[in-house]
Amino acid sequence: MITKAEIRGFKRFAHERFAIAPLTVLAGLNGSGKTSLLQSVMIAAEASKTRSVAISLNGPFGLELGTAEDVLNWETRSPIEIAFEATTGTATWQLTVPSEEALYLEIAERPVDLPKAFSGTPRAFTYLSAERLGPRGFSAASPLPEAELEVGVKGEFCAHVLSVLGDRLIESVDRSHPLYAPAPPRLLKYEVEQWLSEIARPIEITGERASGATVAELRFRAPGSAWVRSTNMGFGITYALPIILAGLIAEKGGLLVVENPEAHLHPAGQSRMGVFLAWL
């Protein structure tokens, strides 16, 4: 597990250290550096999996950082350094700027030993953007194999993930809802339904993908009623679903990063979302 972060020369951070707990909440005034910290995490995640000597500032995880000049700290012109301390040791990335107009950073130094979150293990690192997809009639199917399926940065693959994994037992008994633990693991979709029902209202969910199709579909229903498309559901449910699903399939010991988990939820639902994230 990651316990500390240290950032040098990146955006507003000349040199800052941060403590990381099993549940870490970033709060503060606008422009105080919350997003910059998250962006440094995503840069490290991308740098850990690329075989290139450079990392793009625009594209990975939906990043739109602009040019190298935009990410350099204005107080220091030293190389950007991003480090994470974990129970397995410290991993450090040093990134240099080829030119101020460059749309990438060069990876001058990368760690040999990586925290699990950056190890490339499927579902060990998940980032969910604040701009998650609202209700859609259909959404794209993921191009990844079953063992590597993820919900996507905007939750765009939730329907596909549920169509493949929904009727399977959750992989860890630790992910069984507290009401049912320590009973044997249940189907993933039942766990998703349990948490969504607490956050929003009693609800059932299914993901469907026709054989050979490149799209998948979510359907919902209140217990005992007819199935409806996600376009007939509120934003709160479709905004909360990627968080619940990603959390339940996340690799133990990894890192789940969620921006604005409370978005489009009633205050009572926001409270229950906090309970879910703390329980993970």
Model-identified regions with their sequence ranges:
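Pre-Walker A-like glycine/lysine-rich segment at the N-terminus of P-loop NTPase domains
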Residues: M1-A47
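The start of beta-strands in P-loop NTPase/AAA+ ATPase cores
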Residues: T3, A124, G254-L255
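Short, solvent-exposed loop/turn segments at secondary-structure junctions
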Residues: F10-R12, V25, S32, R132-P135, ...
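Phosphate-binding P-loop
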Residues: H15-A21, G247-K252, W279
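Phosphate-coordinating catalytic segments in nucleotide- and nucleic-acid-processing enzymes
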Residues: A47-P242, A246, E251
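Walker B catalytic motif
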Residues: V258-P261
